[in-house]
Design a protein with these regions (language model features):
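Intrinsically disordered, metal-sensing/regulatory segments
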Residues: 1-275
Length: 275
């Protein structure tokens, strides 16, 4: 652990991003053992992922944003960076959602969203891949921002453990997300190798987002409270626009909600225990 305290935060963010990507790869590998899984189990997994993201948004992002602003001279305006960043994060994801072509899990290809290419329509597999990729980037960015914030005089064991806790939480919820993409692709007729490939590659943006997030806050330390809240807003948009609705459309509302609550508690306990 002492070795980690002396490393560049961008390098640490890269390692964390590679870890979360690796967790997606593990989840995608489920396709080698099952061609299909019950919709109820898939919904529970999505609920768990939503719970982790909601808890991470508050405990690991919004709360530190408010604390940082309070400790750095914002006074009675300490709420402003968190509020502004949170809203900007949601708006940014809405714009991406409106532009990038994608398809939510369980939907027919006719319900694809975003701007479709005129010359060649994207396949269902590609659209599902883009849907997962859209919300994997803010997860990686969130991890990167938490590590980048350590450069602002916060490179303590507690601060480092808090950032690691977020990475572990994101990694945990990436396992069901990987399965949630690879299994439907396999069920749609693709080979196990192709389903695994698409599922795994959907999170390649996470180490990229992690490096970008860490580098950005290192370059402009003043935006740390805004960046933390921005990542939280982006993640909450994904949860409310995609994860929760998708998990609630098949009549499994009770168990899905319980899955969400378990995910929330797991992430909350990890953040408090490690941070």
């Amino acid at each position: 652990m002492t070795w980690l305290l002396h490393q560049n935060v961008v390098f640490l963010a890269l390692l964390a991003g590679l870890f979360t990507w690796g967790c997606t790869i593990v989840g995608s590998a489920i396709v080698f053992f099952f061609k299909n899984i019950s919709r109820k189990l898939l919904d529970i997994m999505m609920g768990f992922a939503a719970g982790v993201m909601i808890a991470a948004s508050f405990w690991s992002l919004l709360d530190p944003s408010l604390t940082y602003a309070t400790q750095n001279g914002y006074g009675k305006w300490s709420w402003f960076p968190a509020a502004a960043g949170f809203l900007l994060g949601g708006v940014a994801l809405r714009l991406i959602d409106a532009v990038v072509p994608h398809l939510h899990l369980g939907n027919d290809i006719s319900k694809a969203e975003g701007i479709q290419p005129r010359k060649k329509k994207l396949s269902k597999t590609a659209l599902l891949f883009l849907a997962i990729t859209i919300h994997n980037f803010p997860e990686g960015f969130a991890v990167g921002v938490t590590f980048g914030a350590l450069a602002g005089g916060n490179m303590t064991l507690a601060g480092l453990m808090g950032a690691i806790g977020l990475a572990i939480g994101i990694g945990l919820q990436n396992v069901p997300e990987g399965a949630a993409l690879s299994i439907p692709i396999r069920a749609d007729g693709k080979s196990r190798i192709k389903a695994f490939y698409w599922g795994s590659m959907s999170a390649i943006v996470e180490p990229i987002g992690a490096v970008m997030g860490a580098a950005l806050v290192m370059w402009m330390m003043a935006i740390i409270p805004y960046a933390l809240a921005f990542a939280a807003g982006a993640m909450i948009f994904v949860v409310t626009e995609e994860l929760i609705p998708e998990s609630q459309t098949n009549g499994n509302t009770d168990v899905t909600t319980l899955g969400l609550m378990v995910g929330f508690v797991v992430m909350m306990v990890m953040d408090v225990a490690l941070g």
